Design a protein with these regions (language model features):
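Glycine/tyrosine- and acidic-biased, solvent-exposed loop/turn segments at the edges of beta-strands
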Residues: 1-142, 147-150
Length: 150
């Protein structure tokens, strides 16, 4: 059974349990302050939750996409920004086997997958900055930076 109210849709399984809820704007999954798509397994356990803006997976501060196995165990958690896997302070994609053991953890920035080492070293100033020759001003005096042998 399907119930449509404006751009909000609810579907039910034949057994009467809720199947899914969807929020739309201009034909695209969209909800600014909440979950745009939520689904359940036929047994009534939650299946997935998705935050979307204009059809794209998007959430600035939190998990964007979550899913669970029919037994209630977590399946995956994903962080998206503007439709791309992205998380600046940790794992962006994490998945579990049905028994609850972790099977994958991935780091992503702006849709690009990074190794754990690349992610942890991305702001390492020693590898990305060469200040030699730069002029700095301290208390009105200018100084030219140079490398000191160690």
């Amino acid at each position: 059974m399907r119930t449509i109210k404006g751009e909000y849709i609810v579907e039910y399984y034949e057994n009467g349990n809720i199947c899914r809820e969807e929020y739309f704007l201009n034909g695209k999954l969209h909800r600014e302050n909440g979950i745009a798509y939520k689904s359940w397994h036929e047994n009534g356990n939650i299946w997935s939750e998705q935050y979307r803006l204009n059809g794209k997976l998007h959430r600035e501060n939190g998990i964007t996409f979550k899913s669970w196995y029919s037994n209630g165990n977590k399946c995956n958690e994903e962080y998206f920004l503007n439709g791309e896997l992205h998380r600046e302070n940790g794992i962006a994609f994490k998945g579990w086997f049905e028994n609850g053991n972790i099977w994958i953890e991935e780091y992503w920035l702006n849709g690009k997958r990074l190794t754990k080492e690349e992610f942890e070293n991305r702001n390492n100033s020693s590898s990305s900055c060469n200040p030699e020759g730069k002029i700095v001003e301290i208390d009105g005096k200018k100084y030219k930076l140079s490398k000191i042998a160690t």
